[in-house]
Amino acid sequence: MLRKIGYFVIMCAALFLLAPSAHAGPPFLSDDPEPVPYQRTENDFFTSATHTKDGTAGTVMGLDANYGVWPDVELTLIAPLAFNAPDGSNAFFGYGDTQFAIKYRFLDESDDGWWPQIAIYPTVSVPTGKASHGLGAGNTQEFFPVWVQKDFDPWQTFGGGGYWNNPGAGHQNYWFFGWVLQRKITEELALGGEIFHQTASLEGEKDTGGFNLGGTYDLDENYHILFTAGRGIQNTSDTNTFSYYLALQLTY
């Protein structure tokens, strides 16, 4: 059974990486409703981390692979090499939790009106990371978000939120909400800002809220740099004194 699951993951990765892209979402926590175009691919090779008073944790290197399997439908695979470095203790490195998702845009944006595009993006996080080392949740989680976007060239705004099902001892279900406003500065550069809020995911844990500033830079038609940096503005020392995301995106 495990061998069959392994073959399935490898086949999914091959589909994402080898298929013949362009599209928002990363580098921000909030996503957008726009799927990768049909039969095209978007691969983000990323690193990210969050620092708190207790230490630093994140992804040393990860793959966020997206494929337009049908018009208005996108499949996503996220595979991270995670780390957890508590202050005053040994650091842990290893494979983290794997995420599978499907995005379906059920409403297109009106070009001459105010109506936005809207999509659902259900996600399943499989507990492939070692929870005892802080590299995974230890249980299967599901996320059920709705994302909205409207373009006002050269401005773009998107965001939304959803509900995380987070089972396990000491865990609790929680909500995430976020919104982004960004502007195209040049043909190559877009800059923006994000605000977000997340309720506590563990019993006795505090809610978190914060902001990120960042954007994208197009090196050429196929290669793009994605970047953000930010921090919490709610329970900051416990949840997020500094965080970053940096990625090389390949679209084809």
Predicted regions mapped to residue ranges:
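Transmembrane beta-barrel domains of Gram-negative outer membranes and organellar outer membranes
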Residues: 23-252
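Bacterial N-terminal signal peptides
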Residues: 8-17
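Bacterial N-terminal signal peptides that target proteins for export
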Residues: 1-9
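Active-site microenvironments that recognize anionic phosphate/pyrophosphate groups
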Residues: 20
